[in-house]
């Protein structure tokens, strides 16, 4: 018969195999403090030894994951020694930062500023603009290995942080290893993480935000303590870093924000015993740390962006003329000339770059759709130089003598003017007749000089309203002044539709009067003065103007979102979100066909398909649990259920928030947009495997039947407790083996460092939709 001490040892060993599932009660194995024990407490000795052994296993696994992560990311970092895919863009942006030249990009500046800083510290001066994929770095004197080392460093830290997230969330060692390995040995993460790109910064910031939030959540029973404040603050800081890198970081805000809202809803419950005052202290703490301060950090990077990029550059054309006036050496402001009445000018629409144009041809009566036009002279938009683009600016009282008093008078903001078409000797007008394409917009045409001076006088008056409408007496300049032309009588604004008119208008653009005079697409510029010969030809050096930060920031934000929505054209490597789930498409990053080398962005197929299966399985389990619980059927023990919804479903919702929004986006999308969702899916896989292997489910058919003898009070099957760890171990080893094999199998296209034969490339083409680039043998 076993002694009491032997029974105690066996009991402790069994207890040690049970993972802690309650997020709040799970403590880091680094901080285990043994209880004070009596001299003969054998059970406590065994428990302490087991905890120490467990802590050592976690540390050993963490170190191994970290070392392997650095090896996979830094392996042959110097290869290829050529520009790869979007290094064309982000390397160029780093050069522009170092040159101080203004550029435009769709992404916030944080990660790009970091790349520029690393390049600066490496001694790079920004002389090379990363012009083409395949350009040799050494030939152009670029310290590319040092610059690549920064994203490689951040990418190397992602798998270890994933490991820590799982550990702090209460999962066992095997679950931690599974989740971190799916990121560690993912080919797409490695490819994106070792090049001059932004995704390494995005993913590192994302996992750090999740890790900090988990640490903060575990301290919810000790609110307002120093550690509580610290983890809350760092959660907000890393959330700010995610959205300051790419706007998809907003999805991380949503993921953590949902959890925070649910937590606040729980605290609002009167059963918690919190006073209203105490609740609002909780609310304000989260508001300032998770919204207010992150927004300040976000603004700071734009402030740095504007203060560094002070010289005119390739991004000027995306911004308003008012913005461009703040940049030194801007050709538009440098070559601008003050406008006087009776100048002959060309007038350009800022949206379509079409010149205001007219010719003797008339509008057809009727149009093809049966609507009736005025039959007047056509006024169109023409995107090329032509003498029919010439218009003379006349004062509103031009036909009232004497004219001499009106010569050499500047045209000013808010003035009423007439526009005289030089080629046909007619004046511009609009009236209450529908335009060719827009029944609600007014037709633009011209009238004779006699009519303009007589009964049509009011119809030919237009007010010049500058985009910067603060000074009503501000003079207008060519190129540098943007304005809208508002009709005095009907209050419509002249606008150019980008859709070409039919053959009767020679495929030129429609000019019409838009009733919405607040839209940003109705602005024009006086592009040039024809035949200028007076003293205005002498250009004086202009000092850049000042513009408030908020005005520059808001304009840039609107431009970024507008340009982002315009990215709808077909791209040979774009893909749909539904393709990412099964890894249906990849992206050709770089190729050297003569050597049969290439870099092809492709995830680890086995890892991606495991994540896809886990997402579907979790969806089924969660739906079944909710539906059955409504019928009074408990499928999960209460402790397991709490952990499932607090932790596993948090990872699930993080995946959902980083994946589903792409289905409603109309812009071009690429495989790398899925990487944040893949990372969240990796966390979910580890959690789900532990749940499936270590926790029992009570069968619905046994509801109402007495609990069997082999099931304890928590719903754990004795058989399940005995063999669950073994099952999980087998599943983990099998999964990791397959994932590592798959990673090494596709490694040549991850690193681009190995020439493969045609047969070897063909064997790697598991799906016909994967388009590899290599020379086929004759």
Curated annotation (Swiss-Prot):
GO biological process, one term: protein O-linked mannosylation
Region (Disordered): 1-44
EC number: 2.4.1.109
Compositional bias ranges of the Polar residues kind: 29-41
GO cellular component, one term: endomembrane system
Sequence ranges assigned to domain MIR in this UniProt record: 336-396, 408-467, 474-529
Subcellular location: Endoplasmic reticulum membrane
InterPro entries membership: GlyclTrfase_39-like (IPR027005), Glyco_trans_39/83 (IPR003342), MIR_dom_sf (IPR036300), MIR_motif (IPR016093), PMT_4TMC (IPR032421)
A Pfam family hit: PMT
SMART domains per the UniProt record, alphabetical: MIR (SM00472)
Annotated glycan sites: 40, 335
Signal sequence, renumbered to the chain: none
Superkingdom field: Eukaryota
Alphabetized SUPFAM superfamilies for the sequence: MIR domain
Known catalytic reactions: a di-trans,poly-cis-dolichyl beta-D-mannosyl phosphate + L-seryl-[protein] = 3-O-(alpha-D-mannosyl)-L-seryl-[protein] + a di-trans,poly-cis-dolichyl phosphate + H(+); a di-trans,poly-cis-dolichyl beta-D-mannosyl phosphate + L-threonyl-[protein] = 3-O-(alpha-D-mannosyl)-L-threonyl-[protein] + a di-trans,poly-cis-dolichyl phosphate + H(+)
Ranges that cross the membrane: 60-80, 103-123, 145-165, 196-216, 223-243, 248-268, 288-308, 608-628, 644-664, 669-689, 726-746
Biased composition (Basic and acidic residues): 1-28
Pathway connected to this protein: Protein modification; protein glycosylation
Protein's membrane topology: Multi-pass membrane protein
Record's keyword terms, sorted: Endoplasmic reticulum, Glycoprotein, Glycosyltransferase, Membrane, Repeat, Transferase, Transmembrane, Transmembrane helix
Disulphide bond pairs: none
Gene3D superfamilies cross-referenced by the UniProt entry: 2.80.10.50
Family label: Belongs to the glycosyltransferase 39 family.
Task performed by this protein: Transfers mannose from Dol-P-mannose to Ser or Thr residues on proteins. Required for normal cell wall and septum formation.
Protein name: Dolichyl-phosphate-mannose--protein mannosyltransferase 4
Organism the protein comes from: Schizosaccharomyces pombe (strain 972 / ATCC 24843)
